[in-house]
């Protein structure tokens, strides 16, 4: 009995020591193939360092928020983006391998615990006839003293290049320059002034970053920003149409009024001609059109984007005109008449000669030539011996 008791106590002591060893064992370190993940807002890059001994030769790619995946720069431990928001907290993730294993993630910019519901909301922008216009709504928790200011810059440049929009407006007040109250709910920027008036120039800015800042007596409120692709945001304007008659022909030509679709437009032309019961539509790629023998006719035209096929302009103003019928000059008419008469005379003479020859042929048919065959009909005469007596004659 005593021996059994000592055996039980020994087993319990051994189990307790094993549990203590388990509790005292250091936790297993979780290792990742990358470390020191960080954002460079000046160059729009997400960089990292490979962990010691990590094999990341299988390829890396990144993702900003819910955007499409971006491959890492060749030979470098970083991904480059076209833009980075300095206002929205965005999650950046690095993936490795074909199975898209998550290697690390980071948020940028760090959340400053500001009241984001006081920031401007629903920022939207569009381009029309050389002007960039943006509108926003006041934050639902913005106090009455909060006012907003809009800045813009080339997306390829950093925040140090921000420039303020000069022409603010609100729902009920239009004013140039900063308004003295918090009524800013939009702003318009003349792109021809700040970018130059030459479309498709080498210095053409393809995208801009729009930032709306807010501030009140309690201090600044979080900002709102957005990257605007100027070509995508451009609202197509109807072309400027002119028409004229060139004799009996009608000539229509037009000029597009879109800055960021230079050379990337097609056109739909509608022609309403009095000689036709229904208007005719033509899809053309060149900015002019000819109609022969036009008569009473009218034109209108609209643009369509070759980049975004669903993007169309409205119809231009319809222009009508009446072109005179085609009139042949007197000299040309005389020459044509003479040529017609001569041609008819030659045809008649030819027919007469043919008729006379045909009649003579029927009245006096030609006598066929006789061909006397020689072979088989000839008689060959051969000399024969004389059978008469010949008496010689002598002189007396």
UniProtKB/Swiss-Prot annotation:
Keyword Ubl conjugation set for record: yes
Disulfide bonds: 62-79, 87-223, 125-134, 165-187, 245-323
Glycyl lysine isopeptide (Lys-Gly) (interchain with G-Cter in ubiquitin) crosslink location in chain: 357
Keyword field: Cell membrane, Disulfide bond, Glycoprotein, Isopeptide bond, Membrane, Receptor, Signal, Transmembrane, Transmembrane helix, Ubl conjugation
Sugar-modified residues: 91, 213, 246, 272, 283
Cytoplasmic topological domain: 356-396
A GO molecular function held by the record: interleukin-3 binding
InterPro entries reported for this sequence: FN3_sf (IPR036116), Ig-like_fold (IPR013783), Short_hematopoietin_rcpt_2_CS (IPR003532), TypeI_recpt_CBD (IPR015321)
Sequence motif Box 1 motif, location on chain: 363-371
Superkingdom field: Eukaryota
Any one GO CC term of the record: endomembrane system
Coiled-coil residues: none
Signal peptide: 1-16
Record motif WSXWS motif, residues: 312-316
TM spans (from-to): 332-355
Function comment: Cell surface receptor for IL3 expressed on hematopoietic progenitor cells, monocytes and B-lymphocytes that controls the production and differentiation of hematopoietic progenitor cells into lineage-restricted cells. Ligand stimulation rapidly induces hetrodimerization with IL3RB, phosphorylation and enzyme activity of effector proteins such as JAK2 and PI3K that play a role in signaling cell proliferation and differentiation. Activation of JAK2 leads to STAT5-mediated transcriptional program.
Family: Belongs to the type I cytokine receptor family. Type 5 subfamily.
Name of the protein described by the UniProt record: Interleukin-3 receptor subunit alpha
Source organism of the structure: Mus musculus (Mouse)
């Amino acid at each position: 009995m005593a021996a059994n008791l000592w055996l039980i106590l020994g087993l319990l002591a051994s189990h307790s020591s094993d549990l203590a060893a388990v509790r005292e064992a250091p936790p297993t370190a979780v290792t990742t193939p990358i470390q020191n993940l960080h954002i460079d807002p000046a160059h729009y890059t997400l960089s990292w360092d490979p962990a010691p001994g990590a094999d990341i030769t299988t390829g890396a790619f990144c993702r900003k928020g819910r955007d499409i995946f971006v491959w890492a720069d060749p030979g470098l431990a970083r991904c480059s983006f076209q833009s980075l928001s300095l206002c929205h907290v965005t999650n950046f993730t690095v993936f490795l391998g074909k199975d898209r294993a998550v290697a690390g993630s980071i948020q940028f910019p760090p959340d400053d615990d500001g009241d984001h519901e006081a920031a401007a909301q629903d920022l939207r922008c569009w381009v029309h006839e050389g002007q960039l216009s943006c509108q926003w709504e006041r934050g639902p928790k913005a106090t009455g003293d909060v006012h907003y200011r809009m800045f813009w810059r080339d997306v390829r440049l950093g925040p140090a290049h921000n420039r303020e929009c000069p022409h603010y407006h609100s729902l009920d007040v239009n004013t140039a320059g900063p308004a003295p109250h918090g009524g800013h709910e939009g702003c318009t920027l003349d792109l021809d002034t700040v970018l130059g008036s030459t479309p498709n120039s080498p210095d053409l800015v393809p995208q801009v970053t729009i930032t709306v800042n807010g501030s009140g007596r309690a201090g600044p409120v979080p900002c709102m920003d957005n990257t605007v692709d100027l070509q995508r945001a451009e609202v197509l304007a109807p072309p400027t149409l002119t028409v004229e008659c060139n004799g009996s022909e009608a000539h229509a030509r037009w000029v597009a009024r879109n800055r960021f679709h230079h050379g990337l437009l097609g056109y739909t032309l509608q022609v309403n001609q009095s000689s036709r019961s229904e208007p005719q539509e033509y899809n053309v790629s060149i900015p002019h059109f000819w109609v022969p023998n036009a008569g009473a006719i009218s034109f209108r035209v609209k643009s369509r984007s070759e980049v975004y096929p669903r993007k169309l302009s409205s119809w231009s103003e319809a222009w009508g005109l009446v072109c005179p019928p085609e009139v042949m000059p007197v000299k040309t008419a005389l020459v044509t008449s003479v040529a017609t008469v001569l041609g008819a005379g030659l045809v008649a003479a030819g027919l007469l000669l043919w008729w006379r020859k045909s009649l003579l042929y029927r009245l006096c048919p030609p006598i066929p030539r006789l061909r006397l065959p020689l072979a088989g009909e000839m008689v060959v005469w051969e000399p024969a011996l004389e059978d008469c007596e010949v008496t010689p004659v002598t002189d007396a």
